[in-house]
Amino acid sequence: METDVTSDTVEVLPQHKFDLRSLEAYLNQHLPGFGSDSRAVLTVTQYRSGQSNPTFFLQKGSQAYVLRKKPPGSLLPKAHKIDREFKIQKALFSIGFPVAKPLLYCRDASVIGTEFYVMEHVQGRIFRDFSIPGVSSAERAAIYVSVAETLAWLHSLDIRSLKLDKYGTGVGYCKRQVSTWTKQYQASAHQSIPAMDQLSTWLMKNLPDSDSEECLVHGDFKLDNIVFHPKECRVIAVLDWELSTFGHPLTDLAHLSLFYYWPRTLPMINRGSHIPENTGIPLMEELISIYCHRRGIDPNLPNWNFFMALSFFKLAGISQGVYRRYLMGNNSSEDSFLTANTVQPLAETGLQLSKRTLRTTPPQADAKSQLFAQSRRGQEVLTRVKQFMKQHVFPAEKEVAEYYAQSGNSAEKWGHPLVIEKLKEMAKAEGLWNLFLPAVSGLSQVDYALIAEETGKCFFAPDVFNCQAPDTGNMEVLHLYGSEQQKKQWLEPLLRGDITSVFCMTEPNVSSSDATNIECTIQRDGGGYIVNGKKWWSSGAGNPKCKIAIVLGRTESPSASRHRQHSMILVPMDTPGVELIRPLSVFGYMDNMHGGHWEVHFNHVRVPASNLILGEGRGFEISQGRLGPGRIHHCMRTVGLAERILQIMCDRAVQREAFKKKLYEHEVVAHWIAKSRIAIEEIRLLTLKAAHSIDTLGSASARKEIAMIKVAAPKAVCKIADWAIQVHGGAGVSQDYPLANMYAIIRTLRLADGPDEVHLSAIAKMELQDQARRLTARM
């Protein structure tokens, strides 16, 4: 059915061979025009793609046809009803809907062994790959628009006018689908797949309230079941109506949208969330919008996760049935055996989607992101993060605060309350996990910067999305510089959230603002290294899940420069000689939530040589790669925290009175509010510019911008927090409000990753160098 039929057909499979002379004799007698050229020879080839009902291309002289038949052998009940295909195509063709013209139906199984029907061959283009290679972005977009509009047309048909009596029940379609595909799967299963059983149970318990909606549904509506005009982006035939009936229209729309969530473990296509920008392929929300506009319905579709989960469940059931026919020897395609490995990942994807809240309208771009544009995926993920924060994270703040208030004197204070662990599982199921790492999330630094701002509004939110420091920086180190063994042993469990980590750099006995002062040693000893030294401000070391430390220490080489004297090495926390000495308070706060900030001693700690990261003398090189994106994350979380502080300040200013006036009516308070808004906008833009520079130029070329935000953001937000405390009076420094804790968190950022003064000196040096280059260029 493509322009080049030979590329899509093969010799008839042995199990599907039939009597050609019998077929030819029957068609000569019953199909008008078939025998017009008595000298022409009938040739028959089989389509590769027919996995359910075998499909054949018939050629006789200038005449071309397509034959569909039932597969031979024992069949599942109510499956392979090709008479229904013929009936629906005949009805649709009569009203001008794009289908191949049905020509005849044969119920006499003696002709070729089973019932069959013949239709016209439609000459056109069929795209087997959802990315539609070989066409322009504009044409690709037009093709998808045509697909969505054709589906909307189908669902808008008046089913009564089609005169398809008893073609389908309609009402209760979703429930019947779950029941039918559960039975079909169970009848053909060759092994136990728990995800299929769990998904079946979930679907039956979460049927949509709108299950009474009915229209004509295709049942397998997807790109490779559509024939397009040879030159135009126009649908000229929709194929394969085997599963058509009266049912819920969103089942078709969800089936069309499968590729957006396709499991990466399956080789057919890549996961749609990583569809490249500017390819013309619409976002799922855009595709839905086109469909809904054509039908005149609201694009905010309820229960979308149900319909997506049902589509994956159904496809998993179909795949299981195809494999069963392969085992029985009556498969319709030579590669049917491959479907055995698709059932489980399809079911697991459906189960994951069942736990997610899926939006069906395009995200509205925030005005603050327009100067440094987000990707389409960045907009979509940010919208979902905001929704998740509103629905789940902010409502949990009180419970989390009470947990740490009550566990202050127990060992549990360094761990997480159950509610955070539940939120983490929910975020992972929603796909809102490891968003900070571009290679995993597909997000740019600008994309993630805006997400970091949102998570900065709640002190435990980064942990919910597995985007907390210092783990983000440590995971970046392992991703960029770790060996395959190091990634497998430590990066993978960190990415899963099974463990946490600590970064050990700062030392109590030296001025660590000059990192070359570091005294901790990493000495080669036979087949390993021995680590000796004292570290402090090792954040997260007290977390019960903290299993690995990245330690910066000296591996002196007399011939190397002062910045090639240090290395980084992995030290498991349970290695003999690793000792947690004491937690360090910050303005009296222990920062239990993040596992505290600890003094850690390494006393003759021996680790294998394979634990060294990248090589001896590469420590500062790794640090620069680690700290660039990390400072973006810190500063944008600070922007988010500033927004929260300003909100608290404004609430207080509106509610309280002093000297017979609301606080905001006092000019000094009004000015604090105004200056706060100005400062927030300034540091947001400066940080987004730094993120944009990393995206476009790389971390090395963005050093000045990164240093500037590291100075500007914490300093500005400290001032905003101070104003907010003033507005609250004594309450501002009490436990009744979070402002004192917020101030403590922000104030430490003026020291973390280097004090302001170090960054200011670096900025001045880079500025003078830039000015000198400009002067030289002018001369």
Curated annotation (Swiss-Prot):
It catalyses: a 2,3-saturated acyl-CoA + oxidized [electron-transfer flavoprotein] + H(+) = a (2E)-enoyl-CoA + reduced [electron-transfer flavoprotein]; docosanoyl-CoA + oxidized [electron-transfer flavoprotein] + H(+) = (2E)-docosenoyl-CoA + reduced [electron-transfer flavoprotein]; tetracosanoyl-CoA + oxidized [electron-transfer flavoprotein] + H(+) = (2E)-tetracosenoyl-CoA + reduced [electron-transfer flavoprotein]; eicosanoyl-CoA + oxidized [electron-transfer flavoprotein] + H(+) = (2E)-eicosenoyl-CoA + reduced [electron-transfer flavoprotein]. The modification Phosphoserine is found at S210. Homodimer. CDD domains: ACAD10_11_N-like, ACAD_FadE2. InterPro entries: ACAD10_11_N, Acyl-CoA_dehydrogenase, Acyl-CoA_Oxase/DH_mid-dom, Acyl-CoA_Oxase/DH_mid-dom_sf, AcylCo_DH-like_C, AcylCo_DH/oxidase_C, AcylCoA_DH/ox_N, AcylCoA_DH/ox_N_sf. Substrate binds at S513, G628, P629, G630, R631, G754. Keywords: Acetylation, FAD, Fatty acid metabolism, Flavoprotein, Lipid metabolism, Membrane, Mitochondrion, Oxidoreductase, Peroxisome, Phosphoprotein. It comes from the Eukaryota. Transmembrane segments: none annotated. The modification Phosphotyrosine is found at Y323. Its main location: other. Belongs to the acyl-CoA dehydrogenase family. Its cofactor is FAD. The modification N6-acetyllysine is found at K163, K166, K175, K765. SUPFAM superfamilies: Acyl-CoA dehydrogenase C-terminal domain-like, Acyl-CoA dehydrogenase NM domain-like, Protein kinase-like (PK-like). The modification N6-succinyllysine is found at K368, K390. Acyl-CoA dehydrogenase, that exhibits maximal activity towards saturated C22-CoA. Probably participates in beta-oxydation and energy production but could also play a role in the metabolism of specific fatty acids to control fatty acids composition of cellular lipids in brain. Pathway: Lipid metabolism; fatty acid beta-oxidation. GO terms for cellular component: mitochondrial membrane; mitochondrion; peroxisome. The gene is Acad11. GO terms for biological process: fatty acid beta-oxidation. Pfam families: Acyl-CoA_dh_1, Acyl-CoA_dh_M, Acyl-CoA_dh_N, APH. This is Acyl-CoA dehydrogenase family member 11. FAD binds at residues 503-513, 537-539, 656, 726-730, 755-757. It is found in: Peroxisome; Mitochondrion membrane.
